[in-house]
Design a protein with these regions (language model features):
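Surface-exposed, polar/charged interaction patches used for macromolecular assembly or partner binding
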Residues: 1-474
Length: 474
């Protein structure tokens, strides 16, 4: 069904994977990731960004595992209870460590944000987004390099609505722009996503290094403490080697577009004789809305006793498993990060049309991928024509909530299968929970009921009709 959607131009950078085989799969997973179909994609330029401005800082903040080691180091190697003064000094050192780690994280994030803003400005991304909206061509067609075809298409007009708009427009196409421009162009977004992949081996080595560094800062009988987890046959060793973690951070920007900017573009560039000035005009800008982090944790149940664990024996199979896990973990982490951004930014929330409206059955094709849960609330919007200013606008006519246990699980269609995962090895493993478990920020993930192919809502059907839009509210 055609209706007015927000538009997104996604970029990816800083995809961190140490294994070259997994790096190829990670990049492919990003390129093939499907945004919710409740958005229009509005691509400009390369989607995978490379360059020194996107290299992750080498000055990494102290990790939680490192911090916990540092916090405990004064206790290790001591045979006598600490005095009150020693305890106070230790606590002071721990606080200083945490403050320094936090300061480093803030500085790194601020620097990264500045790099992204500079990229938007240097590459004139706002201009490119507007050019795409107006179908800019390399040659003039009639009196312009631009046209309104894409705006008309995404404006989701029927024949009657087009007749209404065109009956009052003084210049062909301007009625469509005045009506749809504020709904469509002003809801154009750019996302920059950075992803860090860490498999079990890498996690183990990082934690082992943390312990070794902590040991160097401690002494027993005047000698540094030598800590090395290699060669142990502990349950810890086996467990850490069978995990896979993904951390996603998405930065959200919005195209600045209002009536003043629209008039500036139309008057100065719509009928211009050369587009070069438009493509570099710094009058068109983006604004930063915020960022969100999401994590996905996957663990492999080897079924092996810790004492029988042999790293070399299953490395090959584990690598193959990681190849299968990585796309799924990417989907989960990206979906969750986008869902968090939607909850923080009302205009960025997805809209979806009602599919069924009848007694005892109100449904819409929106689900877990869009962050919908049993507590979600929606407003119902009706498209209304305002004859005075010759525009269509959306008016709130009702509210709806979600029926318990009837939320559509539409997260894993990116894998080329239905959400029940009958033809997908990894989804089946998660479903039976015997060989692999997957968790996100909210806990262990479960595959939804395959018989539910849409989300069921509840509320009064008065004034409702199929095709009306719903939008999630806070």
């Amino acid at each position: 069904m055609q209706y007015r959607r927000s538009s997104i131009c996604p970029f990816y950078f800083g995809i961190t994977v140490t294994n070259s085989e997994l790096e190829k799969i990670a990049i492919q997973a990003c390129e093939q990731y499907h945004l919710s179909d409740k958005y229009n994609t509005h691509y400009v330029g390369e989607r995978i960004l490379r360059g020194k401005e996107f290299d992750k800082s080498q000055n990494q903040a102290v990790t939680r595992s490192q911090q916990s080691v540092y916090d405990r180091q004064s206790n290790m190697g001591r045979r006598q209870p600490m005095s009150r003064l020693e305890t106070m000094l230790q606590q002071s050192a721990q606080r200083a460590n945490r403050i320094e780690a936090y300061r480093q994280r803030i500085e790194e994030k601020e620097q990264q944000l500045e790099n992204l803003k500079r990229y938007l400005e240097d590459h004139h991304i706002a201009n490119q987004l507007i050019a795409k909206w107006f179908n800019m061509s390399t040659t003039r067609i009639g009196d312009s390099f631009f046209n309104m075809e894409l705006i008309q298409e995404r404006g989701a007009y029927n024949a009657t609505e087009l007749e209404r708009l065109r009956a009052k427009e003084s210049v062909r196409g301007m009625g469509i722009l005045k009506d749809a421009g504020m709904d469509l162009i002003s809801n154009t977004y750019v996302t920059f996503t950075t992803i860090n992949y860490e498999n079990g081996d890498e996690r183990f080595e990082r934690m082992n290094k943390s312990f070794q560094e902590a040991g160097k800062r401690m002494t027993i009988n005047g000698k540094p403490v030598d800590i090395d987890l290699h060669g142990t046959e502990s349950e810890f060793y086996a467990r850490e080697h069978t995990t896979f973690n993904v951390k996603v951070e998405i930065y959200l920007f919005k195209l600045v577009w209002n009536e003043r900017i629209e008039n500036y573009f139309i008057n100065k560039y719509y009928n211009c004789k050369d587009t070069r000035a438009f493509l570099t005009d710094k009058f068109f800008t983006m604004t930063f809305l915020g960022s969100e982090v999401s994590k996905c944790y996957m663990s492999e149940n080897t079924g092996m006793d810790a004492s029988a664990y042999n790293r070399a024996q299953i490395t090959g199979q584990r690598l193959e498993n990681y190849k299968a896990y990585l796309p799924l973990a990417t989907i989960v982490a990206l979906d969750n990060a986008y869902a968090k951004l939607q909850k923080k930014n009302e205009d960025f929330c997805v809209k979806a049309p009602l599919a069924d409206v009848e007694d005892g059955k109100i449904t819409a094709f929106i689900g877990l991928k869009e962050g919908i849960n049993k507590k979600s609330k929606f407003e119902v919007l009706e498209k209304i024509y305002n004859e005075k200013d010759n525009t269509f606008r959306y008016k709130k006519v009702s509210t709806l909530t979600v029926e318990k246990d009837k939320v559509w699980d539409n997260r894993f269609t990116d894998l080329g299968v239905l959400s029940n995962g009958e033809n997908n090895y990894v989804v089946n493993l998660i479903k039976n929970g015997k060989q692999i478990t997957i968790s996100d920020d909210q806990g262990k993930i479960k595959i939804g009921d395959a018989s539910i192919d849409r989300t069921y809502l509840k509320g009064s059907i008065r004034n409702l009709a199929p095709g009306m839009l719903i939008r999630q509210t806070k």
